[in-house]
Amino acid sequence: MIPGFSDPQRELEQYPTPPAAALELLERAWQSGDLVGSVADLGCGTGRLALGAAFLGAQVIGVELDEAALAVAREAAADAGLTVEWRCEPVENWAQHVGTVIMNPPWGAQRPGADRPFLQAALATAGSVWSLQPTVSDRFLRRYVEQLGGAVAGAWPVDLKLERTMPHHTRERKTVEGTLYHLHPVGAR
């Protein structure tokens, strides 16, 4: 089990990716042949997606702004005997080309537009992108991806079962309707 955030930052929208949603993303990406070669997990948090991709054989780079979250990810990787390159940097600095980006980025609930730099970086640097997003943002996401020169190659509903992790949460658990998107830059595949 990969631990969650020890001190989740509200402004960074740090929520651990629910295991079932992580499994869905990794399974679909793996079945599509997208976890072979170089993979980046943008906004990797404590490493749930990055470590899953590494377990499946990908050469993974986990990118995260929060050093404390990366410390948890590093420890989980060491405990599992997995190799991941961890980078503490803002996603806006990401420019390395990889075969695939996997991510559960901030959704913009606390900071409107927080998801945009992740989508921009992913579509600019990867041949294939797998992203978990709230279903309520579907129209925006499709338009924005098109504006960035990308295309939605697939979309699947995913229930995101979120546990209470922040002081402002009023319930112990909440299920959010999410969508797993498979995105391509125009001209890819």
Spans of features found by a protein language model:
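Conserved SAM-binding loop of SAM-dependent methyltransferases across substrates and taxa
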Residues: 46-58
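Conserved SAM-binding strand-loop segment of SAM-dependent methyltransferases
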Residues: 81-91
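Conserved SAM-binding motif I beta-strand of class I
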Residues: 59-64
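Conserved SAM-binding loop
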Residues: 73-74
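Conserved short alpha-helix immediately C-terminal to the canonical SAM/SAH-binding motif I
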Residues: 68-69
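Conserved glycine-centered beta->alpha loop in an early N-terminal alpha/beta scaffold
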Residues: 43
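S-adenosylmethionine
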Residues: 89-182
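S-adenosyl-L-methionine
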Residues: 1-40, 51
